[in-house]
Structure formats: C-alpha cells, structure tokens
C-alpha cells in the first residue's frame, strides 16, 4: 500500500539532510589558523572558490572575521552555559563544533545565526576603527536630519553596518548558495536572521553642544549595541525556534505543525529534534554531561536533576581564594583582603557504561 503524499513530504527534509554529507561552515576554523592572510586563506579547508577569492582580496576583512570568531563563540557559550550542550568547541576539528551540528537542530540554527551576526559585528566595528581599506564610517550619515527631539547634525562616526551585512552575506552564504538541499536553505535562513539581529540594535547616540551644557546643537551618530544584546535576542529566538518541513516545490519552508505560526525572516528554523545530550555519543557529536558542574538548588536547566539526566552527582569539598573585606579608600581605590572560602561543588556522575556509544 502506497504512503499518502503528505507523509512523503513530511519525510523529505530528513531524507535530504541524510543525503547531505557535509554541512559545516569551515570558515569558522579561521580562528585556529591565524597567521598571515595568505596562510589563513590557503589553510582553511573547505572554502568554496568565491570565499577564497574574497579572502585573498580583503585580508584586512579576514583578520576582522578571524578575530570575531572568538567573540561569537564566547557569546554562544555564555548563552548555553547552563545547558547540557554548552556550545563547546573542538580545537582540531575543521568545523569547530564537531558532528553535533550535522543534525538540523535548534542548536545548529542558533550557531549559524550567531556566527553570521558575529561576522557583521566584527566587520562593521573594524570599518569604524579604520582597520579596513574598503570601508569607513557610514557615508550616508552626513548633513542635518530631524528626530522627535528636533534637528541635529550627523557627526562622529556612524557604524557602516550596511557594508558589514553586504560582505557577511557574500562571504558566509557562499557555500550554502552552492547547495540545493534542505539544510542549505535552513542555514541561509538562519544566517539572514543573525545579520538582521545586529542591525535591530543599531542605536542613535548624540552629544549636546551649548553654553553650560545646554543642547542648542546636537551631533548624532549610529552605533551598534554591545554584542550581548544580539546574543540575548537570538537566544530568545532559539527558545521560540520553529520546526519546519520543505514545501512541495523544494524552494522554501512550511511549518511542521499547523498550530505553529509561519516563520518570519527574524525567526530561527530547524528540521530535526535535538538529542538529549546526556551521554557521550560519537555519532551525534555529544560529549555528554559527565563531570559537568550542576546547581543543587536550581530548578532550571543547570539543576543537578536536569543536567545529570537522573544519574546523580558527586560532591567535592573545595577551597578557593576570594576577595573579601573590601573597603573604599579616598581617593580613589578599593582595597580587599584575600580570604579562603570553603564550598561544595557538585558534578554529574558518569553513566555506568562510560565508553563511547553509537546510540542516537
């Protein structure tokens, strides 16, 4: 008996994902290569031709992107710090994160979005700091303008975020645009959501000029907010990520569950449910939670009950040096004493079979 047509389409994205042998963004590995731009461009594996051309033509932009990798990976680890999967990186892995992102999960959606956002942020900042020859401050922010407070003059250095977005789109999306599979479309969608997130927090800053601090004349400029705001925003999008399936002509998505809203360009999308990340699983790329510190009094994701997946925890009595008895001394220093603090540290027990498993 033949399966209903609707059932075939529900399975199609998973089939396409299984047939896709490699979905990692190898440019993430730029952080590990370092060195000169030529060394970096020639030694990052898996770059497509257009990425390698951009790499050679714009060494100053590549330096900014390379430095930015550390920033967005740190932000990813901050957002996932209390979760079983904590955005851990693998130094010798060309994909930076290992096999865990081969699954088209919520975690993959977040990493692609935060990495794309990180590229926009790094390039735009480098432009404003005069570190990139091909861009500078936003050339459109000149002359006078008007807002709710009245007329002001554009001055200072407005962040040229449009250049950052344009270059990030050309470089980051290049590999995905060569693919026609479901995972490539998912990555492109989440890359765009990440870029849009940075621009969302572009804010106008102003300085007043006048006698005795009066604001008879204002000079304003546009500046990116701290990257933490982008990370927090994408974290909320991660928690509200929408599971999708491919539409029938293979050009876009539709929601996997009719009760869910249709994803917007700002939403994160994913195909597959995440593993539980409880145990070390070579195939899934999960390191498990054995040895992870848990919070005995928490009721959240970092609680010992949740983090340790019901396996229990070990308690160690440790001492650490802390600052105590701090006092302010005029003017202008804070002086503290060094004190020993005793505390209990709780870590998740390993499963009875601690060897690598191939279970998914």
UniProtKB/Swiss-Prot annotation:
<dbReference type="GO" id="GO:0060716">
    <property type="term" value="P:labyrinthine layer blood vessel development"/>
</dbReference>
<comment type="similarity">
    <text>Belongs to the Wnt family.</text>
</comment>
<keyword id="KW-0217">Developmental protein</keyword>
<keyword id="KW-0325">Glycoprotein</keyword>
<dbReference type="GO" id="GO:0022008">
    <property type="term" value="P:neurogenesis"/>
</dbReference>
<dbReference type="GO" id="GO:0005576">
    <property type="term" value="C:extracellular region"/>
</dbReference>
<feature type="disulfide bond">
    <location>
        <begin position="127"/>
        <end position="135"/>
    </location>
</feature>
<dbReference type="GO" id="GO:0030182">
    <property type="term" value="P:neuron differentiation"/>
</dbReference>
<protein>
    <recommendedName>
        <fullName>Protein Wnt-2</fullName>
    </recommendedName>
</protein>
<feature type="glycosylation site" description="N-linked (GlcNAc...) asparagine">
    <location>
        <position position="295"/>
    </location>
</feature>
<comment type="function">
    <text>Ligand for members of the frizzled family of seven transmembrane receptors. Functions in the canonical Wnt signaling pathway that results in activation of transcription factors of the TCF/LEF family. Functions as a upstream regulator of FGF10 expression. Plays an important role in embryonic lung development. May contribute to embryonic brain development by regulating the proliferation of dopaminergic precursors and neurons.</text>
</comment>
<dbReference type="GO" id="GO:0060502">
    <property type="term" value="P:epithelial cell proliferation involved in lung morphogenesis"/>
</dbReference>
<feature type="disulfide bond">
    <location>
        <begin position="76"/>
        <end position="87"/>
    </location>
</feature>
<feature type="disulfide bond">
    <location>
        <begin position="326"/>
        <end position="336"/>
    </location>
</feature>
<feature type="disulfide bond">
    <location>
        <begin position="208"/>
        <end position="215"/>
    </location>
</feature>
<dbReference type="GO" id="GO:0048018">
    <property type="term" value="F:receptor ligand activity"/>
</dbReference>
<dbReference type="GO" id="GO:0060501">
    <property type="term" value="P:positive regulation of epithelial cell proliferation involved in lung morphogenesis"/>
</dbReference>
<feature type="signal peptide">
    <location>
        <begin position="1"/>
        <end position="25"/>
    </location>
</feature>
<dbReference type="GO" id="GO:0010463">
    <property type="term" value="P:mesenchymal cell proliferation"/>
</dbReference>
<dbReference type="GO" id="GO:0033278">
    <property type="term" value="P:cell proliferation in midbrain"/>
</dbReference>
<dbReference type="GO" id="GO:0005125">
    <property type="term" value="F:cytokine activity"/>
</dbReference>
<dbReference type="InterPro" id="IPR043158">
    <property type="entry name" value="Wnt_C"/>
</dbReference>
<dbReference type="GO" id="GO:0060492">
    <property type="term" value="P:lung induction"/>
</dbReference>
<feature type="disulfide bond">
    <location>
        <begin position="324"/>
        <end position="339"/>
    </location>
</feature>
<dbReference type="GO" id="GO:0002053">
    <property type="term" value="P:positive regulation of mesenchymal cell proliferation"/>
</dbReference>
<keyword id="KW-0879">Wnt signaling pathway</keyword>
<dbReference type="GO" id="GO:0048146">
    <property type="term" value="P:positive regulation of fibroblast proliferation"/>
</dbReference>
<dbReference type="GO" id="GO:0005737">
    <property type="term" value="C:cytoplasm"/>
</dbReference>
<dbReference type="GO" id="GO:0050769">
    <property type="term" value="P:positive regulation of neurogenesis"/>
</dbReference>
<dbReference type="InterPro" id="IPR009140">
    <property type="entry name" value="Wnt2"/>
</dbReference>
<feature type="disulfide bond">
    <location>
        <begin position="308"/>
        <end position="348"/>
    </location>
</feature>
<dbReference type="GO" id="GO:0062023">
    <property type="term" value="C:collagen-containing extracellular matrix"/>
</dbReference>
<dbReference type="GO" id="GO:0055009">
    <property type="term" value="P:atrial cardiac muscle tissue morphogenesis"/>
</dbReference>
<dbReference type="Pfam" id="PF00110">
    <property type="entry name" value="wnt"/>
</dbReference>
<feature type="disulfide bond">
    <location>
        <begin position="137"/>
        <end position="157"/>
    </location>
</feature>
<keyword id="KW-0449">Lipoprotein</keyword>
<keyword id="KW-1015">Disulfide bond</keyword>
<feature type="disulfide bond">
    <location>
        <begin position="331"/>
        <end position="332"/>
    </location>
</feature>
<dbReference type="GO" id="GO:1990909">
    <property type="term" value="C:Wnt signalosome"/>
</dbReference>
<feature type="lipid moiety-binding region" description="O-palmitoleoyl serine; by PORCN">
    <location>
        <position position="212"/>
    </location>
</feature>
<dbReference type="GO" id="GO:0045165">
    <property type="term" value="P:cell fate commitment"/>
</dbReference>
<dbReference type="GO" id="GO:1904948">
    <property type="term" value="P:midbrain dopaminergic neuron differentiation"/>
</dbReference>
